[in-house]
Amino acid sequence: MPMSATKAHHHDTIEAAARKPIKERPILFSTDMVRAILAGHKTQTRRIIKPRNNYSIFVGWDDEFVLNDENKEWTLSECPYGYPGDRLWVRETWTKQLSGKYIYRADHPDWELADYTATGAWRPSIHMPRAACRILLQITHIRVERLHDISADDARAEGCTDPGPIAIGEYQTLWEKINGPESWALNPWVWVITFKPV
């Protein structure tokens, strides 16, 4: 079936957006997920879509649209993490030694910091400056789906190591650890971001 004029316009819009100059944006990862990225086990991340007020979600034609419930018009919703080709610089738990060198909890989970750092404590990933970043990722693909649509292969791409369908259960445990108890049951719409190290 041919693409409608409206959807063709949206398709052209996202194609044009993908040709914009490459941008870099920060993204937070937990210590366990940083280790999975460094080990080459994690090449995907799922992030909850936060709809605008009075908007609902529609997915089609491999693009993501939102419907304004007031005027019933579809508009393209930009992924806040960027487009394929854009880069994500990873924020992780970190600190700074008295020498000025940055160190990372993913590398030293049990290290006693008091005698070796300026602050004497690990600092949250949200406070990491760009200068401290050591992991840069390039987005290779973005799609939208319900959380429960994740496949076993995708769960392994998320860094889970259990074989077969068990990987989905492992990912559910990981999701609730990050997003809170019962968050899996909500089955939200999520951005599925596939990436590779730069």
Regions found by a protein language model. Give the residues of each.
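Secondary-structure transition motif
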Residues: 1-198
